[in-house]
């Protein structure tokens, strides 16, 4: 019997016949004869003494054949059979990531993306397609560029083609010096002659890195924003639902808006209701019955004044703090379905195909009439930072106007249905998004600085509203036939982040809270649903805001 730390186990009795066959190996095997198997261990101390004496000698190995399976008694010593790979039996089981570990993983991935982009450029394929991994590929190394915009040195590494007279396996693994020059230099005369125009053009380019105020490059910001919210979860249900009986199911109207004063205005039939985002109290501002009905609403950018468009073609200004009308402005001959503010200028679009610019401070309020649209104007949105106005109409046209000019700067006719949904990006200059109706079902993104279309997204349903997030580089779209859903999109990847469901009819109205944290959607199912989508970055205080109706405000 073999003795090991007080435990006994049976061993093979024919080990003495193979002692002279494997003298070169130095493995420890206790192969005693049958005469020694009768000996027993009386105490644990003798077992340790015999084990030390056995290790001081060199024992030959057992014959080279499969060892019989043994049932070892020591539960602390695993069976180390040669045919068993321990890593397959003792692999650590990875459980689901906790929220803390998930955030840490996302942060690590974003930081790695930032370092790659800043140190090695935006082409991630250079990390994988090295010359060693792919010897038959051509690798272009970006050349250092001076302030003059001229490539002083051109460095290109190429692998020469293999010859047909030699073994391809040998040549692919043998470094060969290129037959042409690696470095190219230009004489000062040729350099000045060929690059004078390029130098001036490059130095005047506003997109140069030295003119940027950001600590990172623009491509890095796009990469980080694209991966920041990748795969994040959206709420499955709204955190508040309000009944809205009498909410019109008309695609061409705009009956919902959330002001900077944290008041939500909604028009139900002929009445305008105000819901306080602070106290959740509901107030009836005014009832226009029986003389008129409400067709559009829009809060002033700063303050508590609300513009109301009516079916008769008039536009009224109301002070929501006192629920009193301050003035009435005429001009349209039919209903006013779209309103948009640019400081003290209120622009209105009507069913008479006209757009009116009104200065609310002047007695003679409207000073410009735009007549480029051929059918009803159903979408208006000012970009106050660049003084650009975007308008959409039932003539399937999207137009961009430079300030108060009478002719459009651009006129796009790519949509094949009415263009009501319009929104400007608050994060990039000149980026505009527009959505088409039932026959179109697309969201198109435009670069208004160049007058070109950037993206075309087929949503599969009617696009009723578009709204860009104030906090993140994302935009929200609401849809009618046939999905009746709310979608969140990432920019610039234009990938769908998620979908909000719950409405049972067309989601015709959309507004965002003043802090940019929540949105509210209104549908023809006569409900208002509140969704929390973003994290608030700052607190907005209505008491510190100046209004264009403030008498102490200067007239520009």
Curated annotation (Swiss-Prot):
<feature type="modified residue" description="Phosphoserine">
    <location>
        <position position="187"/>
    </location>
</feature>
<keyword id="KW-0539">Nucleus</keyword>
<feature type="compositionally biased region" description="Low complexity">
    <location>
        <begin position="12"/>
        <end position="37"/>
    </location>
</feature>
<feature type="compositionally biased region" description="Basic and acidic residues">
    <location>
        <begin position="69"/>
        <end position="78"/>
    </location>
</feature>
<dbReference type="InterPro" id="IPR019775">
    <property type="entry name" value="WD40_repeat_CS"/>
</dbReference>
<feature type="repeat" description="WD 7">
    <location>
        <begin position="502"/>
        <end position="541"/>
    </location>
</feature>
<protein>
    <recommendedName>
        <fullName>WD repeat-containing protein srw1</fullName>
    </recommendedName>
</protein>
<feature type="modified residue" description="Phosphothreonine">
    <location>
        <position position="98"/>
    </location>
</feature>
<keyword id="KW-0853">WD repeat</keyword>
<feature type="compositionally biased region" description="Polar residues">
    <location>
        <begin position="126"/>
        <end position="146"/>
    </location>
</feature>
<dbReference type="GO" id="GO:0005634">
    <property type="term" value="C:nucleus"/>
</dbReference>
<feature type="repeat" description="WD 3">
    <location>
        <begin position="331"/>
        <end position="368"/>
    </location>
</feature>
<feature type="modified residue" description="Phosphoserine">
    <location>
        <position position="62"/>
    </location>
</feature>
<dbReference type="InterPro" id="IPR036322">
    <property type="entry name" value="WD40_repeat_dom_sf"/>
</dbReference>
<feature type="compositionally biased region" description="Basic and acidic residues">
    <location>
        <begin position="43"/>
        <end position="55"/>
    </location>
</feature>
<dbReference type="GO" id="GO:0031145">
    <property type="term" value="P:anaphase-promoting complex-dependent catabolic process"/>
</dbReference>
<dbReference type="Pfam" id="PF24807">
    <property type="entry name" value="WD40_CDC20-Fz"/>
</dbReference>
<keyword id="KW-0597">Phosphoprotein</keyword>
<dbReference type="GO" id="GO:1905786">
    <property type="term" value="P:positive regulation of anaphase-promoting complex-dependent catabolic process"/>
</dbReference>
<dbReference type="GO" id="GO:1990757">
    <property type="term" value="F:ubiquitin ligase activator activity"/>
</dbReference>
<keyword id="KW-0677">Repeat</keyword>
<feature type="repeat" description="WD 6">
    <location>
        <begin position="458"/>
        <end position="499"/>
    </location>
</feature>
<comment type="similarity">
    <text>Belongs to the WD repeat CDC20/Fizzy family.</text>
</comment>
<feature type="region of interest" description="Disordered">
    <location>
        <begin position="126"/>
        <end position="173"/>
    </location>
</feature>
<feature type="region of interest" description="Disordered">
    <location>
        <begin position="1"/>
        <end position="80"/>
    </location>
</feature>
<feature type="repeat" description="WD 2">
    <location>
        <begin position="289"/>
        <end position="328"/>
    </location>
</feature>
<feature type="repeat" description="WD 1">
    <location>
        <begin position="246"/>
        <end position="285"/>
    </location>
</feature>
<comment type="function">
    <text>Has a role in cell differentiation and cell cycling by negatively regulating cig2 and cdc12-associated cdc2. Down-regulates the level of cdc13, particularly in a nitrogen deprived environment. Regulator of cell cycle G1 phase progression. Prevents onset of mitosis during the pre-Start G1 period. Required for degradation of cdc13 mitotic cyclin B during G1 arrest but not during mitotic exit.</text>
</comment>
<feature type="modified residue" description="Phosphoserine">
    <location>
        <position position="214"/>
    </location>
</feature>
<keyword id="KW-0131">Cell cycle</keyword>
<dbReference type="InterPro" id="IPR033010">
    <property type="entry name" value="Cdc20/Fizzy"/>
</dbReference>
<dbReference type="GO" id="GO:0031568">
    <property type="term" value="P:mitotic G1 cell size control checkpoint signaling"/>
</dbReference>
<dbReference type="GO" id="GO:2000134">
    <property type="term" value="P:negative regulation of G1/S transition of mitotic cell cycle"/>
</dbReference>
<dbReference type="InterPro" id="IPR015943">
    <property type="entry name" value="WD40/YVTN_repeat-like_dom_sf"/>
</dbReference>
<dbReference type="GO" id="GO:0010997">
    <property type="term" value="F:anaphase-promoting complex binding"/>
</dbReference>
<feature type="compositionally biased region" description="Low complexity">
    <location>
        <begin position="159"/>
        <end position="169"/>
    </location>
</feature>
<dbReference type="InterPro" id="IPR001680">
    <property type="entry name" value="WD40_rpt"/>
</dbReference>
<feature type="modified residue" description="Phosphothreonine">
    <location>
        <position position="177"/>
    </location>
</feature>
<feature type="repeat" description="WD 4">
    <location>
        <begin position="372"/>
        <end position="411"/>
    </location>
</feature>
<feature type="repeat" description="WD 5">
    <location>
        <begin position="414"/>
        <end position="456"/>
    </location>
</feature>
<dbReference type="InterPro" id="IPR056150">
    <property type="entry name" value="WD40_CDC20-Fz"/>
</dbReference>
